[in-house]
């Protein structure tokens, strides 16, 4: 029976996921298939390359670096997180990514993305990070603060828009047992997002994005109900923070990140 790994997003809250995956590396825990959403896809890279501590360093080493993120990058490039630094300078030079180990890992990794034209989630293979880095970037491209990413003629944004917790996909993909890592605390339920009119205006050419945002809270909470049922059935094991934390999606406080 195949066991899958499902990683929720959460932007800088993903530092929690990085810590969980470091524990898995220490314990020698592997999974047949792994599904990463947004920051979860980023964390999945360092897990599959078996580089303990690397993703935590990526989250925390560049907090004061204006080349890493910020309004200047957003205004200059359309991306709050600087694409050149995040997806090229860091893995290729500043904090080298082990491409060879990643490529040899028998586990299959998938970056969850949202097709902004169809409004559907897609699960892009992460087979080779030299070729598939844009799949990870697309998965982590948050609305309003990121440009859509074009891959093979299709435009994508953050996978969390269409499938925040892809447990059902993991099950239908053959993983009857799954470990789910969430960045939201026990008891969390999503509420209707703010800035819906801004979303509607920004993505006027892609109305599916607005539809997804309008329905996101209800869809997310339905996924939580399904997850809870799978946990009760013994077919899913859930790891998440036990209590609320002060870490924001764009968090620059190193102490808060370390505490999480």
Please tell me what each predicted stretch does:
Residues 1-37, 45-260:
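Patatin-like phospholipase
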